[in-house]
Every structure is written in structure tokens, then in C-alpha cells.
Design a protein with these regions (language model features):
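N-terminal targeting signals for export/organelle localization
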Residues: 1-32, 144, 172-182
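A short beta-strand-turn-helix
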Residues: 27-50
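Hydrophobic beta-strand anchors of alpha/beta hydrolase catalytic cores
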Residues: 51-52, 85, 133
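Solvent-exposed loop/turn segments at secondary-structure junctions
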Residues: 56-60, 90-95, 115-118, 140-142, ...
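Structural microenvironment flanking redox-active thiols in thiol-disulfide oxidoreductases
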Residues: 66-103, 117-120
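Thiol-/selenol-based redox modules, centered on thioredoxin-like
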Residues: 135-182
């Protein structure tokens, strides 16, 4: 008889290797939404900081959050930070995913939904409900997560950590007037 704690234990033991692969798996699974389909895309080179945005078309708080996410992302990129958002859809269909990205004018890539379902490390980061934001570095290390186990810390702590780390990059010239997320 199998125990339900065994998969969690195996994932915990394998976490360093899984974390190292997470950035690479995300980078290898990127898609660009087009009106009728998702098309593969590649980064050259991949950014050093990735904000994984877990959301869905059916989620009202997700719709409310996207303008803030887009504003922070655009400000960081304009400042020269090497960072990008990747959307991880929790929608039931590719059509809903594309509709949500189009309605919200998301300029960033989306993770291939079929591949995302086969990434246990990614699924473990999603949290119990959307929206969620997870910041990872080039080694796949999780730097901030809106969910800590079953406790929802919220999106603001992740946005603040993202701003701090992105602005600490040598090439970034972030404004000193406190434009960071509130």
C-alpha cells in the first residue's frame, strides 16, 4: 500500500536538482499567444529574474492584478533590469488562456500549458488558488512566493522583492523616487 507522503518526500529530496532545472524548463516551454494558436518562442539569452504569474480568465482578482504587474514589469525593463514575466495559466482551455492574455494586453510569454502540467516543481509553486506570483533566479531558486504552504502572503511582498532584486542588477538604473510597488 502506497503512502500519500511518499511523493512529497521524494520531491523534497530531489528539490535541489528540480530547482536547477526549473529555469531551464520554463525557458524551454515558452509560447507566444496569437489570435488562433500558441506559437513556440525562445529567449536569447533568458532573463536572470523570472516572475511566474499564476492566473486564470475566470479569476476576478487576477484581472484586477494584471495592470499592476504590467506596470512593475514595464518600469523594471525600462530601467534596464534583466527580467520578464511568464504567465502560467490555470484556465481549462487554450482559448480561455488566449482570451485572457488578449483582454489584459499581456506582453509577456506564456508557459506551454501541456508541458506545465508535467512539471511537478512548477505545480508545487502554484499555491492553493490564483493569483500567485513566484520570483525565480537564473539557477531556478525561488526567491519569493505569494504562498507559503497553506498561508497566502499575497502579491505585494513578491512585487517588492522583485523590485529590490531587479534594481540591484548592475545594469539597472531604477528611479529613486519610490516608484516600486506598494
Amino acid at each position: 500500500m502506497r503512502s500519500s507522503w511518499l511523493p512529497a518526500l521524494l520531491l523534497a529530496l530531489a528539490w535541489p536538482a528540480v530547482a536547477a532545472d526549473l529555469h531551464a524548463q520554463v525557458s524551454a516551454s515558452l509560447m507566444r499567444p496569437e489570435p488562433r494558436a500558441l506559437r513556440p518562442m525562445q529567449w536569447s539569452p533568458p532573463p536572470t529574474l523570472i516572475a511566474l504569474y499564476f492566473g486564470a480568465d475566470w479569476c476576478a482578482p487576477c484581472h484586477a492584478f494584471v495592470p499592476t504587474l504590467r506596470g512593475v514589469r514595464d518600469a523594471l525593463r525600462e530601467a534596464g533590469a534583466d527580467t520578464e514575466v511568464v504567465y502560467v495559466s490555470l484556465d481549462e482551455s487554450e482559448a480561455a488562456l488566449r482570451r485572457y492574455m488578449h483582454l489584459q494586453q499581456m506582453p509577456w510569454p506564456v508557459l506551454d500549458p501541456r508541458r506545465a502540467q508535467r512539471m511537478p516543481a512548477l505545480q508545487a509553486l502554484a499555491g492553493l488558488a490564483p493569483p500567485n506570483l513566484v520570483l525565480i533566479d537564473a539557477q531556478g531558486t525561488v526567491l519569493a512566493n505569494g504562498w507559503q504552504g497553506r498561508h497566502y502572503r499575497g502579491l505585494q511582498p513578491v512585487l517588492q522583492e522583485w523590485w529590490k532584486r531587479a534594481c540591484a542588477q548592475q545594469q539597472a538604473h531604477c528611479p529613486d523616487d519610490g516608484v516600486q510597488p506598494r
